[in-house]
């Protein structure tokens, strides 16, 4: 074989091997540089400089709710976990979006690591056969006259970057999504919400509803005006199985006010929307989200596909 700097003739073409090798190396290096600089390639490191700040998108909530009669199958995990009697039920479905408007990411990481550490952040869902995040959001339907509160059927959450949040100046998010994998038993996940992104639970997903006809053991919701109240990262009282992760303060009874996720501001975590529940919504339903079928056989792990 000739030396690297010797000419080689082949079919009338003369090529310097050393130049060919150098050109190939340049192409490889250029490929790595372009991939590293591509806006579609998420950074391998989360942005933890600063503080996260979660809110509830009440504009989206006000535009995506519907009251209707809907068949709920016994095989749906939200039916089992919510204690709902299968069959045709009158429900109100709604969308919840929780943008991170802070200047740092919400970083949760792999559920398997948290379960191994027994830190109380996740619990195992026997129906879904994966882990659910505890205390991510609280769904309440409130009678504004009596103050009575109904709870929703949803039990589990998985935090992902599902939707970019436009900046105030109209620019795109500062970078691509970072958190795109819920994970499962033995399968690593990477959960969280990047700043400039939101985690969205569409109204057609499993558990995104209140049962209105008493089919979940709660009192029947009479026709009238009601408030849907969503609290993201709600406060909780710590227990032996759920220790206090981030302390906000002490209440009047001397109890700790704790949160699962750190934020710069907990006072903006509540969003409310006024809705009207009719007497007979029917299968077509009443509300701004009329016309789209539910996907009760999917939950947030199966059907929340990041953009």
Protein language model annotation of sequence segments:
Residues 22-32:
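Bacterial N-terminal signal peptides
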Residues 38-307:
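Extracellular/luminal regions of secreted and cell-surface proteins that mediate adhesion/ECM remodeling
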Residues 18-20:
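N-terminal Sec-pathway targeting helices
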């Amino acid at each position: 074989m000739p030396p690297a700097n010797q000419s080689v003739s082949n079919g009338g073409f003369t090529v310097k091997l050393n130049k060919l090798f150098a050109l190939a190396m340049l192409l490889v290096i250029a490929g790595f540089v372009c991939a590293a600089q591509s806006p579609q390639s998420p950074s391998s490191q989360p942005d933890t400089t600063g503080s996260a700040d979660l809110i509830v998108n009440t504009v989206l909530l006000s535009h995506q709710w519907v009251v209707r009669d809907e068949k709920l199958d016994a095989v749906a995990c939200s039916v089992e976990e919510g204690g709902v009697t299968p069959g045709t039920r009158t429900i109100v479905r709604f969308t919840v979006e929780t943008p991170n408007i802070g200047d740092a990411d919400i970083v949760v990481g792999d559920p398997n690591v948290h379960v191994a550490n027994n830190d109380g952040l996740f619990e195992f869902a026997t129906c879904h056969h994966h882990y659910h995040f505890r205390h991510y959001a609280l769904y309440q339907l409130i009678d504004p006259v009596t103050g009575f509160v109904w709870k929703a059927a949803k039990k589990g959450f998985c935090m992902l970057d599902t939707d970019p949040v436009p900046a105030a100046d109209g620019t795109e998010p500062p970078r691509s999504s970072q958190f795109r994998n819920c994970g499962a038993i033995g399968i690593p996940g990477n959960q969280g919400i990047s700043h400039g992104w939101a985690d969205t639970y569409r109204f057609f997903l499993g558990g995104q509803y209140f049962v209105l006809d008493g089919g979940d053991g709660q009192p029947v919701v009479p026709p009238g005006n009601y408030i849907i109240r969503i609290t993201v990262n709600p406060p909780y009282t710590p227990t032996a199985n759920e220790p206090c992760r981030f302390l906000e303060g002490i209440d009047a009874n001397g109890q700790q006010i704790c949160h699962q996720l750190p934020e710069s501001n907990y006072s903006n975590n509540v969003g409310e929307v006024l809705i009207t529940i009719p007497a007979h919504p029917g299968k077509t339903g009443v509300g701004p989200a009329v016309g789209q079928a539910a996907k009760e056989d999917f939950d947030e792990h199966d059907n929340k596909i990041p953009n």
